């Protein structure tokens, strides 16, 4: 490893939250480092078309949007470092970080390492990712207008995705491995109304065995349903599959270092600034590591902006 590299602000993560934080920190003349991590560009790199980014009504790919953010950050003199931080020491300032390639110190750290959606683990799932298999109905649902789709999951996210899709797709097939949904009652009440309208078909005690398709994308699912005495297999014709079985925040290295809940970093959300401060002053968090509800590119960018402003205020207080 080279000698220790120091920056006033080090940003961990290269998704919308990380790059937005870098842009704001650079404009404040804080000369930020942005350490990309292994998942460069974040989840958006797997999104073929984005139709809800303000100002880009002609659609934009996730990779194109992230490339724009990268160029913007570079133009403002952000130092983008291709490394992955594997260990941190937040006990005293300057904070100490160890990467696979270098060691770093910083007066303030912004954690924007994101979260990864959980998948079913099928080989065919990887084959059709971005070609019919998605983890975000708000991002990709509109492409299936007047088509039949399936949703897998049994919690709040799965029910919310199902209800959202049912507003414009032809039919939603909701597949759940259990016999009872884990969602809130208000969501289940809405689901019941949609079922009566025959917009949603429920498959309980069921799992997806295989995803079928061709070069154009997904065409059908092979599902297995467990009855009291036997298992039966059936095929349903769909154009898309939305996997909604949860997310895993990329926060393992912060366990026992920061206050967390279910893997998500807890922030103070104070009324007058420090909305993104973690349990340690000077350490801030943004994007999907703090958000298990909205998970949109624009909300991640917004929290990245707030984290940079909070971090700037903290650094100024050290002078």
Curated annotation (Swiss-Prot):
Cofactor: FAD
Molecular function via GO: thioredoxin-disulfide reductase (NADPH) activity
Keyword Secreted tagged: no
Location of this chain's protein in the cell: Cytoplasm
Binding site for FAD: 36-43, 288-297
Signal peptide interval: none
Catalytic activity: [thioredoxin]-dithiol + NADP(+) = [thioredoxin]-disulfide + NADPH + H(+)
One term under GO cellular component: cytoplasm
Pfam family, one: Pyr_redox_2
Primary location group: cytoplasm
Entry EC no(s): 1.8.1.9
Enzyme's top EC category: oxidoreductase
SUPFAM superfamilies the record matches: FAD/NAD(P)-binding domain
UniProt record, GO biological process: removal of superoxide radicals
Note: The active site is a redox-active disulfide bond.
Protein name in UniProt: Thioredoxin reductase
Gene that this sequence comes from: trxB
